[in-house]
Amino acid sequence: MTIAHHCIFLVILAFLALINVASGATEACLPAGQRKSGMNINFYQYSLKDSSTYSNAAYMAYGYASKTKLGSVGGQTDISIDYNIPCVSSSGTFPCPQEDSYGNWGCKGMGACSNSQGIAYWSTDLFGFYTTPTNVTLEMTGYFLPPQTGSYTFSFATVDDSAILSVGGSIAFECCAQEQPPITSTNFTINGIKPWDGSLPDNITGTVYMYAGYYYPLKVVYSNAVSWGTLPISVELPDGTTVSDNFEGYVYSFDDDLSQSNCTIPDPSIHTTSTITTTTEPWTGTFTSTSTEMTTITDTNGQLTDETVIVIRTPTTASTITTTTEPWTGTFTSTSTEMTTVTGTNGQPTDETVIVIRTPTSEGLITTTTEPWTGTFTSTSTEMTTVTGTNGQPTDETVIVIRTPTSEGLITTTTEPWTGTFTSTSTEVTTITGTNGQPTDETVIVIRTPTSEGLITTTTEPWTGTFTSTSTEMTTVTGTNGQPTDETVIVIRTPTSEGLISTTTEPWTGTFTSTSTEVTTITGTNGQPTDETVIVIRTPTSEGLITTTTEPWTGTFTSTSTEMTTVTGTNGQPTDETVIVIRTPTSEGLITRTTEPWTGTFTSTSTEVTTITGTNGQPTDETVIVIRTPTTAISSSLSSSSGQITSSITSSRPIITPFYPSNGTSVISSSVISSSVTSSLVTSSSFISSSVISSSTTTSTSIFSESSTSSVIPTSSSTSGSSESKTSSASSSSSSSSISSESPKSPTNSSSSLPPVTSATTGQETASSLPPATTTKTSEQTTLVTVTSCESHVCTESISSAIVSTATVTVSGVTTEYTTWCPISTTETTKQTKGTTEQTKGTTEQTTETTKQTTVVTISSCESDICSKTASPAIVSTSTATINGVTTEYTTWCPISTTESKQQTTLVTVTSCESGVCSETTSPAIVSTATATVNDVVTVYPTWRPQTTNEQSVSSKMNSATSETTTNTGAAETKTAVTSSLSRFNHAETQTASATDVIGHSSSVVSVSETGNTMSLTSSGLSTMSQQPRSTPASSMVGSSTASLEISTYAGSANSLLAGSGLSVFIASLLLAII
């Protein structure tokens, strides 16, 4: 476009603007519906790179609506457009403002852009609507509400690509028809249509004269053909204020209402809103009177509206006019009319006119009375009353009441102290009744003067906050003159630890409450001094009403507290009595700890306080600390050449899962009526108590036996550690077993370990220190258990009986329960032994006696749920231990049973090897099955053992401080003496029929056997363990009996040397290494 054409275009636009301003006839609207903030925006399709369609005025006015409508949004107040196309660079994709683009498509700060400017891009950059801002036409419609009357100048700062703006009805859209199709007017307020192959100037404007309070239709149409899109919109108000981009508070939308007849206001300058109201009133005239009154009101949209009120007065009937005369104090006659509504006898309401004539009263009918009041000036009022004269006629009397300020005697002045720094005066009015029964107003003037310095008290208190807090509390104290006085207490709270604050209340002879803070230093159990704050509150009381009492308590410091009680004296009057309670720390012996099992999953600690009366007759508080620990399963382990099997059993009644030997299955089906004995054993820092608890933790004991072999499994309390074994056996190895269980309340999962104690065995003395006291109590009973027998992967269950022994051990406040099942056997053993522990290196003397005898017990045998009772002999084992003068007695009953176990046999192939040459033979074998449960997973272990012909018997006995076991295997004899720290375990042992068929398996035991007499040193770690012996057939062992004899001879020599001097020990070690 040339410069000449450009100038002509601007002149035309200016001329059109002047015409609009001069005419002042822009059409406005007054929609009656509910207005909504913002404008509605409709989106229409526009072809990419179409640079001709948007240059058509008809298209920009209404032709766009023929295109595909893409959607719409509402409530938009920020109506400017500023869209930037994306730039895809090596550093990422970012919107690039048009003013930052350069060269052959590059963007400042991002470098060269690899994408094209001439393609369509989708985004929600236009009013949140997902479309292609690069090529689109949109229409904005709404109502502009001018806040002032005057000229409004709208402006497009720049246009890219084409836009128009129209203001006014019949130009933008018709009133109350915002959502209708666009009208065909091309009389644009701002014409920003881009000419064909040309450009537009900046800052295109259009001016409209608008009247405040009217709604003017506003429409903006914008088209973009490619790439960037720009349309900043602003308006300048008559007062010079400019609104840019955000038009909130200026643009609104209304729903269409085509039926509203008065929606369009063609010329607001001559528009007036008026209403006519007609009212009818009765009057005393004889004709109808009509009058008109004009008022101006403001309507809801802020417009002034003229209101015409037509008043019609009609004559009332004579009977509805009432005239009344009243005297008054004026000097002239006053007439007034009052209108009331009365209901006649016909039930119809009728207007009644009351004419009130007030005439001046005669001087004699006027009464004047004077009353005092609390005001500061004289008040005069008139009251009208009616009196009846001597002639019986009523007469109006006027009473003039003059209220004068009250005399000085009715004014009371009181002075009160207060904590302010200036004098405060206030007036309070009260009503009192005089002797004449009449109420009288009394004025009380209260003067508050600053109190003297002595009435302000400052106290410091500790608190648990992290900063210093200052507050003021007002209290009232009564002095000796009986007058109340305000006292100000300034409380300063300083941070301190929570546990070091003590508050005590003390009576005193003063007349007010005194609060003070005392700081003392106490030394804690760690030896460190700590500041303690004691808040002392002293309350007034008579000297004789103070009582002090001292009580013991379990704290580590002295506590003083004050308790207030009310007593009634002989005069019947209540009196406050102050009781000062001083609690002093009790001795350590008044704190008792007890441990109880419970079914919870955690350890619970609670404290119970009881009061006991000592020998001096004084009550003393005793603190009982109750520790409840959960009962859990006890783990037992079986060590063998094939590894370790761990099983755990927890049940409300004992369950035995036997590990069968390779040569048979043991089934016990009898029960023993329980008898119990209570004993005690003192050991290091442990308290042992025993009781039968069916729901407590149980330990599963493995049982091994043959059909012709019986076993005795005593329950014992013994020691293990370094042990000396004297063995006479023809076997090539030894066997040992014990039961290991964890303390369920121990903080670790290791085996229980106790400090060493002194024990004595034959031919050996050992010295060690004794720990603090431990007590053991054991009780026994019988129960029915389920025995599972398996063959060829088929298992059956049967009911059997066993003796149940339960013991509890308390170490450092942690209690462990041990349960033992003692099977009923046929072995009879009667033997007594004695052991003596001598005092060495200052340790205490201990004497251990073990006796075994037989007695008769009642046995219940059950089969197919039918039980019978028989009398049977039983072995009674008794052990006593004396440590520090405390004796522990442990008794075990094991019945002598005649029950034989049932076995199952099958044919197996036996491979025998000698000197590297192996041969296979077929032999009958006993099949047994063992089960192990780990984490609720059950594993079945079958064992096949070729049958043997030898028989053996086993007898064992228990010793509290020592353990001595005698094993009969043909001509073999085994004696074991054990010295170690005290360990609690249940011992179960059986022997097989073969003298060469015993295999020892213990992770911490080294044993050497010989054919003759062999001295074997066994070293065992401090533990509580469980071992179950297993047998191995002679045919499965490598080597001949000759070789075994030769090795045993070396072993015998080595063991003999071990008991000699140091040189002998060295030689013995070489011999053992050769073996």
From Swiss-Prot:
The number of the intragenic tandem repeats varies between different S.cerevisiae strains. There is a linear correlation between protein size and the extend of adhesion: the more repeats, the stronger the adhesion properties and the greater the fraction of flocculating cells. Belongs to the flocculin family. GO terms for molecular function: D-mannose binding. It comes from Saccharomyces cerevisiae (strain ATCC 204508 / S288c). GO terms for cellular component: cell periphery; extracellular region; fungal-type cell wall; side of membrane. It is found in: Secreted, Cell wall; Membrane. It is a lipid-anchor; GPI-anchor. Residues 322-345, 367-390, 457-480, 547-570, 702-762, 959-977, 1016-1026 have a biased composition (Low complexity). Glycans are attached at N135, N187, N203, N262, N663, N749. Keywords: Cell wall, Glycoprotein, GPI-anchor, Lipoprotein, Membrane, Repeat, Secreted, Signal. Residues 1-24 form the signal peptide. Residues 197-240 are annotated as: Sugar recognition. Residues 1053-1075 form a propeptide. Residues 322-349, 366-394, 456-484, 546-574, 702-781, 948-980, 1016-1038 are annotated as: Disordered. This is Flocculation protein FLO5.
